[in-house]
Amino acid sequence: MTNRKGWIVTLAGMGLNLALGILYAWSVFKKQMVAPVDDGGFGWTNQQATLPYTVAIAMFALMMIPAGRLQDKLGPRIVAMTGGLLTAIGLIIASFSSTGSPLPAVIGFGLFAGTGFGLGYAASTPAAIKWFPPEKKGLITGLVVAGFGIAPVYISPLTKVLLGNFGIAMTFRILGIAFAVTATLFSSMIRNPEKPLNVAKPGVSKTSFGGDKTWREMVRTPFFYMIWLQYAFAATAGLMIIGNMASIVTSQSGGALKAQAAMFVALLAIFNAGGRVIAGVLSDYIGRIVTLALVSISQASILLFFPRFTTFGEFIVGAAVVGFSYGACLSIFPSINADTWGTKNMGLNYGVLFTAWGVGGVFGPMLAARIVDATGSYQTAYNVASMLLLVSFVLAMLNYVQVEFDMSQREVTIRLGAKKAIAKVVAAKEEAA
């Protein structure tokens, strides 16, 4: 019965995130908003059209902290439902945007929907994880957050059809009403178990540092800051592409792939979702840090080639690698959080860690928008993001290869991840005279 209830909560969390994932479809709205007024757009600059998305990301990240505390105290159902309703209201407010100012979109999509994203997202993952043993953290986290990643698969083409038939304003209103219904339905099924299932199988460690930690204890560890930086760098690179994918395809193809731009947004979303599930399962077997290092170096490599992409096939490869790598991080980091600092306070703890995603999410899209407005090219932004991911790879390696010194015993111990020592060097003790 417990497993059945746990899977219901997991699928409900995935469903809620499937609705909240409208954030990742913003590039379709942006493409229409920067279009000339004669073509049904607003004639906004890239920076104006990116601003609501950037504000939404910032609010998303900032709200994860109070939302995490609220869901730890009040339970996930109330928090998730409130988040869903705020997102719906925000979409309706955004429908009042016009050629004159992006303010309604900034207030509606940025502030209201961004707050809703944070509340809903903070409630879904911790609740699902608490229903399962530690060795399934990666799988369950991946499944729940996959809903957020795969959302553009249906939202992007749906939004494109709605924009073509009803225009920007009515599209926001239709999506807002639909969102209110679906988010309320899924939120009603999300709840915590009476007691988290923290019993691991023999040989499986419950947490790396032994027991549940508060956020204050968490931020006192050097490991937290290394992980925070890696999360920020991954978000910078991933959201830079996700938030501008339709525009990137249209621009770098010289307009040849303009009609297929929304398809690439959906393709990126498929790999985004796949990365969350596959990397979650993979990290359960080979370790979180190793998986993180692999996706960091993969994404860094592909971004070096992105400026040269102009054809259909090249953009497929680019969308696949970036989507998978970014999605992988969104399941690896919550799992690292639960492994290291426990599940009791995970809502608040992960909210604090999630500020890294917010910083990266604000920096990445706005950097790309500023650069393309100034130079007409994304190349410099790609190079910066690739360098950040290389730093993330190095940090992951430093986390994985640990060297411990015991001066009293004259020992040097080398460890790989959380495994037993692979080498131990003991200095010869001096014989007593």
Sequence positions of predicted segments:
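C-terminal transmembrane helical hairpin of 12-TM major facilitator-type secondary transporters
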Residues: 237-240, 259-336
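Hydrophobic core of transmembrane alpha-helices in multi-pass small-molecule transporters
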Residues: 102-119, 232, 314-328
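Interfacial helix-cap and linker-helix signal at transmembrane-aqueous boundaries
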Residues: 33-34, 70-71, 154-166, 249-250, ...
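Intracellular juxtamembrane helix-capping segments at the cytosolic ends
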Residues: 33, 119-133, 140, 328-341
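Central cavity-lining transmembrane alpha-helices of secondary-active solute carriers
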Residues: 51-69, 266-278
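Helix-loop-helix hairpin linking two adjacent transmembrane segments in secondary transporters
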Residues: 144, 148-194
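C-terminal ends and interior cores of transmembrane alpha-helices
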Residues: 85-99, 298-310
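Extracytoplasmic gate region of multi-pass secondary transporters
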Residues: 26-33, 216-279, 364
